[in-house]
């Protein structure tokens, strides 16, 4: 088995074929490019041959004279010639159209013979294409066509487009998950969509313009860390709010007791102390106290303390 590469095409466009008993077997594939090259070579050879065999001006002039004025032995001369004999100068230059006419006729005849030969061999070429079964092909190399950085950028854009399409097709599910997380109707789940929506919801509550598409650049580990941080922050904040409400209730009771004892200057102290001031001044201490006392995130206790805080501000207990 002999493999012969045909490399008359471009660098990456390489075709190979293998046949038994090559080169004795002449029935191999000829591509359209090879056929055009053969035709061009044949025309060039014809032009060179015609330029080499063109007769001299004297020979063309004598041939033209023989055609125009035949000999005396010619029957046409005996019957038709009525003009007197004239002297013809041999060194007269021949007409240019005569030489071009001869060259064009020879070229047309050779091209006709070549076309006939090609048409006769066309069936054999088509049969050889169906008979050859061991012809491997090779596609152009992608490394030459595309740049590495450009291919990476195209892949990244394709991934972003696919994620956007997936988010568009699942918009209703995303809205349901967002509603459940926002109103707390279901506990947090460790799914990718819930984590991402929880992060976006927290960012929007704090006035940060963040969308789900902005989180596409984050890896799964980063999403998990952000989600855990937000969850821990909410839990610690709930514990801190419980301690803060207890402090506000105690301050209101002390204010009423001092007013009862006649300290009018203490009036309005409870209105000056708010949750924000407590959070700024002793927020970390409240968090530490809640952790030491083991106060958990109890929604019931938080609601009770909130209601009690409102009533203590309005009602005089002492």
UniProtKB/Swiss-Prot annotation:
GO cellular component: host cell cytoplasm
Coiled coil: 145-172
Keyword Kinase: no
Keyword Coiled coil: yes
Pfam families: Pox_A11
Major place of residence: host cell
Upregulation: Expressed in the late phase of the viral replicative cycle.
Post-translational modification as stated in the protein's UniProt record: Phosphorylated by a OPG054-independent mechanism.
Keywords attached to this entry: Coiled coil, Host cytoplasm, Late protein, Phosphoprotein
Intracellular or extracellular location(s): Host cytoplasm
UniProt-listed InterPro entries: Poxvirus_A11
Family: Belongs to the orthopoxvirus OPG137 family.
Function recorded in the entry: Required for viral crescent formation early during virus morphogenesis.
Subunit record text: Homomultimer. Interacts with OPG160.
Protein name: Protein OPG137
Organism whose genome encodes this protein: Vaccinia virus (strain Western Reserve)
């Amino acid at each position: 088995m002999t493999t012969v590469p045909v490399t008359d095409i471009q660098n990456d466009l390489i075709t190979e074929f293998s046949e038994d008993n090559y080169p004795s077997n002449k029935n191999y594939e000829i591509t359209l490019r090879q056929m055009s090259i053969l035709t061009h070579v044949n025309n060039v050879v014809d032009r060179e041959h015609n330029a080499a065999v063109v007769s001299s001006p004297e020979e063309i002039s004598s041939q033209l004279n023989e055609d125009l004025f035949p000999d005396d032995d010619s029957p046409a001369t005996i019957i038709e010639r009525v003009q007197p004999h004239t002297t013809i100068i041999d060194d007269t230059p021949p007409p240019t159209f005569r030489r071009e006419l001869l060259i064009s006729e020879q070229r047309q005849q050779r091209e006709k013979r070549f076309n006939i030969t090609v048409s006769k061999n066309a069936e054999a070429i088509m049969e050889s294409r169906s008979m050859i079964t061991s012809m491997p092909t090779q596609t152009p190399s992608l490394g030459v066509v595309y740049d590495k950085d450009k291919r990476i950028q195209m892949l990244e854009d394709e991934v972003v487009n696919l994620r956007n399409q997936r988010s568009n097709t699942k918009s209703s599910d995303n809205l349901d998950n967002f509603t459940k997380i926002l109103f707390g109707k279901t506990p947090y789940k460790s799914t990718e969509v819930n984590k991402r929506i929880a992060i976006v919801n927290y960012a929007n509550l704090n006035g940060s313009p963040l969308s789900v598409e902005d989180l596409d650049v984050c890896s799964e580990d980063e999403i998990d860390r952000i989600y855990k941080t937000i969850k821990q922050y909410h839990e610690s904040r709930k514990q801190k709010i419980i301690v803060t409400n207890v402090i506000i209730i105690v301050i209101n009771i002390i204010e009423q007791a001092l007013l009862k004892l006649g300290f009018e200057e203490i009036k309005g102290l409870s209105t000056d102390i708010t949750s924000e001031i407590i959070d700024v001044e002793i927020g970390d201490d409240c968090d530490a106290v809640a952790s030491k006392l083991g106060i958990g995130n109890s929604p019931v206790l938080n609601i009770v303390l909130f209601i009690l805080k409102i009533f203590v501000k309005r009602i005089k207990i002492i």
